[in-house]
Amino acid sequence: MTLENKKILVAGLGGTGISMIAYLRKNGAEVAAYDAELKPERVSQIGKMFDGLVFYTGRLKDALDNGFDILALSPGISERQPDIEAFKQNGGRVLGDIELLADIVNRRGDKVIAITGSNGKTTVTSLVGYLCIKCGLDTVIAGNIGTPVLEAEWQREGKKADVWVLELSSFQLENTESLRPTAATVLNISEDHLDRYDDLLDYAHTKAKIFRGDGVQVLNADDAFCRAMKRAGREVKWFSLEHEADFWLERETGRLKQGNEDLIATKDIPLQGLHNAANVMAAVALCEAVGLPREALLEHVKTFQGLPHRVEKIGKKNGVVFIDDSKGTNVGATAAAIAGLQNPLFVILGGMGKGQDFTPLRDALAGKAKGVFLIGVDAPQIRRDLDGCGLNMTDCATLEEAVQTAYAQAEACDIVLLSPACASFDMFKGYAHRSEVFIEAFKAL
């Protein structure tokens, strides 16, 4: 991709946008910056980093009318808006940081493991990265997991990696056309971001863009959307919690298997829950696809301790166990967390629902939940969607109130689970802040 002397507008000035500005300027592009709401202190801060950088704010159309060749979008900005559609129709190109990285790794020959899905993608990305490092590969872990890919590339000063392990969101995949992963997975599809996509099929089609090229596909045999993503002529590795597959769970023995070969007992996996058994199978399949030995992978799986805020036990009070799954920001994630826990539950739900339908939680909660505590702006919708299913639902003004009320109703061996099925920004700075408040409320009991 030729960037020299191209006139490029970078839209969105978070970490990804800043990394794109740095990369594009280094490669000779004429770069300007845009943000819909641009505070003077932010202009000053970024201006100190990039001498002579021109800033635009207000309407995106007005900025684009200045003769730009390329619009480089941060993932939080949808390209499905009239101003951007008109820009493309007039010959402009729209891309993001993943497309820029794809150009780099394609030229250099770096291997890429790419991971997406509605739920589990951060856990699988972390596990795959951990396994690659433990097996001796020079590994870069980047993308939606936290470090922007071009920032990671900048830190490496152009040095080729043995493997890039990329967590990719649907937002990042929207304008990615050239990425050709060595191995890739869509872990699952459930309702998420339906405030951005036309419907669930539209969302699934965007996720499936991760399978461009001819690399190994790792697919969830239990998910109808994932089954439909199989590409003709491609090597596919299937994983399943329900029936025999390339990688599968033998329920009677509680062991993961590869075909007929025994792999590992679920009790030897530090990660809790059946959904994490699926995550381990996907991770091992991805790592094998880049040539890592199975025996070493399984040994290292036993030492991976997982991530904070993902079905994480934070403590026990008078026999009542408190579990933090603040990262459960959609219905599918919360349903998986509930399915993976055995004891009776009191579940804290609510926040910003992102246009989801919460009725699938009726089946997930049935027979397991003793009570539900609702918080946040979309608590009324959750109550409507769950109404009539026989659950005792309590509205709480704060997360602290929900923790106190749940604890007052719980008995020894019960679980109080924070798994909101919603984003957090109506009440908190993010899911990590929500987790901190939950933990402090537990400590205050």
Swiss-Prot record:
Q: Which family does it belong to?
A: Belongs to the MurCDEF family.
Pfam assignment, any one: MurD-like_N
Annotated positions binding ATP: G117, S118, N119, G120, K121, T122, T123
Q: What is its EC number?
A: 6.3.2.9
Single GO BP term: cell division
Reaction(s) catalysed by this chain's protein: UDP-N-acetyl-alpha-D-muramoyl-L-alanine + D-glutamate + ATP = UDP-N-acetyl-alpha-D-muramoyl-L-alanyl-D-glutamate + ADP + phosphate + H(+)
Q: In which pathway does it act?
A: Cell wall biogenesis; peptidoglycan biosynthesis
What's a GO cellular component annotated to this UniProt protein? cytoplasm
**Under what name is this protein listed?**
UDP-N-acetylmuramoylalanine--D-glutamate ligase
Top-rank lineage group of the source organism: Bacteria
Q: Which UniProt keywords apply?
A: ATP-binding, Cell cycle, Cell division, Cell shape, Cell wall biogenesis/degradation, Cytoplasm, Ligase, Nucleotide-binding, Peptidoglycan synthesis
Q: What is its main location?
A: cytoplasm
The record's subcellular location field reads: Cytoplasm
**Functional description taken from the UniProt entry:** Cell wall formation. Catalyzes the addition of glutamate to the nucleotide precursor UDP-N-acetylmuramoyl-L-alanine (UMA).
A molecular function (GO) held by this record is: ATP binding
